[in-house]
């Protein structure tokens, strides 16, 4: 089973909704079944958010705001896109999307209760080991 960034898992607003999805993963896998997911790292958010970033893409500029609700471990994400060649206006990010982020320790605890064992974790597709200083958290697990 494969779950990549911008998918449903790890991108829902609260623990209840995410736990429903985690349970579906566990039930869908046979013993020995493998799961790989790519989520934003909650440990990174604890020390690096709030922040604002910009990304110059091929067709436009994206301004992103990352706010952090520490008590809920929830990212409030907003963005504004500007297409090259169009007039700029003052960015207003009225409402952001709330996303509950998890640390590797939290995912390990949740998965353990569901019969999933974490085999490895990475920070990117090169195989770099995960750390609290990397925004991506890729987790490889097996159903036991």
Where are these regions (language model features)?
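A short SAM/SAH-binding and catalytic strip from SAM-dependent methyltransferases
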Residues: 1-17
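C-terminal lobe and adjacent flexible extensions of AdoMet/dcAdoMet transferase-like proteins
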Residues: 98-144
């Amino acid at each position: 089973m494969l779950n990549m960034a911008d998918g449903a898992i790890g991108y829902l607003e609260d623990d209840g909704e995410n736990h429903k999805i985690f349970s579906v993963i566990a039930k869908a896998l046979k013993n020995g079944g493998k799961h790989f997911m790519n989520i934003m790292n909650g440990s990174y958010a604890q020390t690096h958010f709030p922040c604002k970033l910009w990304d110059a893409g091929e067709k436009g500029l994206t301004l992103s705001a990352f706010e952090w609700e520490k008590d809920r471990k929830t990212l409030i994400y907003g963005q504004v896109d500007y297409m090259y060649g169009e007039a700029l206006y003052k960015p207003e990010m009225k409402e952001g999307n709330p996303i509950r982020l998890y640390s590797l320790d939290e995912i390990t605890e949740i998965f353990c209760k569901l019969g999933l064992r974490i085999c490895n974790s990475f920070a990117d597709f090169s195989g770099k080991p995960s750390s609290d200083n990397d925004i991506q958290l890729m987790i490889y697990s097996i159903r036991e």
